[in-house]
């Protein structure tokens, strides 16, 4: 077993993968630079991941991601590199920031986040530091925290999941467990949900969720925010049910509150008493060691009235040489 982290940066222990990260060589940096030049030449109108090295498709760049935040380029490095490699990466990024492709894209700020260090410090290589930044995805607006926290506030790999929820939500009561900053809730309200109940222990994250709803001019009387430990709050959750759609998107590991392999079955076990007669569940996992079969088998054991329907695709900007190690977003239907 080795210490690593899931595709969003949460610490987990997994079996050693066969293709170990390679040194970040000059050739690897040239590959990254060329990729970013091409991406900036056709910069998207909305927030997107521009480079997903963590999918292990580019040797030497396995621990690096680059996100386009509509004028802000956020580069995240998840594992230590040598001082020489870090300096070379910084210089390459500075060169990129003074290129014609950079100017033509409308970019103005460039951040390098060192996710492997305590508190994930961020270096502002270009542009004036800003604490909050508003972005757009699929026509919806979200507020991000830049340079202050490990995660900025929206997991871009779940883009298709949010779109799916928006398409499914009309007229439904929705339960959003492990809600974080309520991205699913925003999508559900935009899709015409009757009510959304968000639960997360992190009240600061839920507060940002309120901000996200306000950015989209949503009626907050349709949204409930529960800042509680789920395993001590089943009664509060049930009070607002039954639910037509339940979303479960937990961290792989949260010290003192959630261990996916141990606690996920406890959540699944409660679904039959929370779900409406023909309700739907979107069950998600980012832990590399746990493939989709784990969730399918766990659901069959803990909530046999729910049947696997489909696995949502991951966005194409998140290629992965081992798809079962990437994000799993599985749909289950009650019959």
Show the residue positions of the predicted features.
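Conserved SAM-binding loop of SAM-dependent methyltransferases across substrates and taxa
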Residues: 181-192
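Non-catalytic substrate-recognition/targeting regions of SAM-dependent transferases
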Residues: 59-60, 65-67, 88-155, 163
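Conserved class I S-adenosyl-L-methionine
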Residues: 171-178
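S-adenosyl-L-methionine
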Residues: 204-241, 245
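Non-catalytic accessory regions of SAM-dependent methyltransferases
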Residues: 1-70
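C-terminal catalytic and target-recognition region of SAM-dependent MTase-like enzymes
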Residues: 280-335
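A short glycine-rich, Lys/Arg-flanked "PGG" loop and its adjoining helix->strand segment in the class I
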Residues: 264-277
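Conserved SAM-binding motif I beta-strand of class I
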Residues: 195-200
